Amino acid sequence: MSQEPKARDAEVADFRAAVLDKLTYAVGKDPEHAFDHDWFEAIALAARDHMVDHWMDHTRQAYRRSQKRVYYLSLEFLIGRLLYDSLSNLGLLDVARDALEGLNVDLERIRLLEPDAALGNGGLGRLAACFMESMSTLGIAAHGYGIRYEHGLFRQAMVDGWQQEQTENWLDFGNPWEFERAEVIYPISFGGSVETVNDTHGQQRQVWWPGETVRAVAYDTPVVGWRGSSVNTLRLWRARALEELHLERFNAGDHLGAVAEVARAESISRVLYPADSTEAGQELRLRQEYFFVSASLQDLLRRHLNMHKDLLNLPDAAAIQLNDTHPSIAVAELMRLLVDQHEIPWEKAWELTVGTLAYTNHTLLPEALETWPVALMERMLPRHMQIIYLINAYHIDALRAKGLHDFDVLRAVSLIEEDNGRRVRMGNLAFLGSHSVNGVSALHSKLMKSTVFAELHKLYPQRINNKTNGITFRRWLYQANPQLTAMLVEALGPELLDDPEGRLANLVPFADKGSFRKQFAAQRLHSKRALASIIQDRVGVTVNPEALFDVQVKRIHEYKRQLLNLLHTVALYQAIRNDPGINWVPRVKIFAGKAAASYHQAKLIIKLANDIARVVNNDPTVRGLLKVVFLPNYNVSLAESIIPAADLSEQISTAGYEASGTSNMKFGLNGALTIGTLDGANVEMCEQVGADNMFIFGLTAQQVEARKRAGDFGASAAIAASNRLSDVLQAIRSGVFSSDDPGRYAGLIDGLIAHDRFLVCADFDAYWDAQRRVEELWHTPQEWWRVAVLNTARMGWFSSDRTIREYATDIWKALD
């Protein structure tokens, strides 16, 4: 039912008054002289007040019902902008828009002033953000725990086509959504030594005498669920020194030395993923991971003891989910807290630890399963290294007692890697210390059992399970694409907004309605025009909104194969030049994504993309049939502009390497067609959407694995069989796209030919053929838009609400 006009008018008036109140008394500005940023802060604070009311109610209910709590530990939370997200979930978006209109303030203009919170990088952090929102929507009592990075990863700029990392200053104007909890402080220790002592009962105990201690200070951000149903807490930790100023040294004239401890402590929460190519960088990463894990575990144990007489029922009252290997030191830290601080016997402490912890694996790349040098661990966390040795000893002894003496198997399941220097295997630690280990797509979970955790799976065959990732439709449909949302609501009714997971399938019959397909195409064109304007503003390239928008936006990594896309781009460019008379499909190739600061090969791929763009976009013989764009500084807000405008979604990772992917789901939900390999969640998308409604190509995971076993990474055979591929590689290698430095890409191409680890060349011809199928379908608009509608209609299963319901039912036991 629609709201009564009088009630609606009152709500608008109340919100307008609340904004004016915040502008005057919280921001300290008169409406006549307020800047746009002052208005943003006032609006955010007014919205936050509404969130706090729901927050307090939800928190009180959770305590009153002794509801089981979920603690989600993640090094990243890519939450993006929160103004529209919060207003939309509270049902206040239209109210706020009308209220501000009466003040001659444009909410859309104000929205753009909010910086993206620099708390993550890619899919891992965005998944965590979607999960937090879904947990609130489903009424699960949850806390997210992470780090309040002052500068995040980095702001990506392009200097002569090269990625340049610049400081991200997202907190310059403060953060109106957060509450500093100055009273919530925990000591976090590093270094020092461990002493064996006898306690009052004559029992030997270990005492850690740390060499350094910093403080973890809590900052809370409310996370509101759909319709304001419930509000959970994202608690982020900021590192502070124990002593802000060494006054004696300062007065002695050592002004820099007086604040050296402050700089060292605060560096922990300064940036996300500091480069780990140096020993100092590795040390800082380990400090970060332990810092937030220790603070979070101390905090949740304190909360538990406020409600329960002891910790012996911890697994019944709390579920701790480790998002990837970054928080896996939690296994050793929880054992330390239980054994050393709460004096729980080792065997019981281990039972509680395993019963409480669960681990999500996000990668099959061995190099991405973190390992730390034993020497570094012994120096930084000596007590934890003792605990890890002891866990490993019990583990190996138990296996031997069961008759397992195979040296290779014992070496594979050990927590200590002995090859190439002794290192602690954090993936194995997380596996052993958790009662559940899940993958994030059906294929990924299957491959976990046969690759990275093959031997551990044989020992614990019930531990690995699958929870295919999902996305929140509130962010990636309602907020990112309001035009499409309005269309869907008109077609399916307003109930869709509360149950998209169940009701989207009712859209299937509309795919055969010409009028609906026409509407669908029109709303896409609207989004493409908006993106074309952004492209013009940011990189100065004019694109045709009626061209096919072919999009690959994600972290730059060799296994994601942006290089394969670029090889196709060059091949297409050459084909258009050689045969301009063909009825080519006008196409805009759109790339975006960041490369890790120390990842040279990925940064070279970005440079290649920009070099190709420069040549193609300035070649008059192409007649605008092909444009290439690399949009810098990809983040959530840019994704919200790109995804609704995409016609073709590139999901072309080497099969068996992408754990799941979630951009595939976001594009599919908005009606983009997918060109991709049978990798990650593409497999399940294929099952839901239908293989006929996607462009699947390339080697399967099984074929890739067979090549790996055979060591078959040479590209010579593929190149010899494909004149098109040979011409492309020759053009890049010879400097056609790098006339200022003709040898710039010689190493890249020679490396590809000699050892094509990610099988770019092997899949090239199949990829070219799939792209030709794309062009054929685009030439038949009524069929293209029929398939586009079907993609949207069949994406309901990929809701993060479904994913979280599965976690809560199968792993956390947290749904009533």
Question: Model segments located where?
Answer:
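A conserved ligand/cofactor-binding region detector
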Residues: 1-816
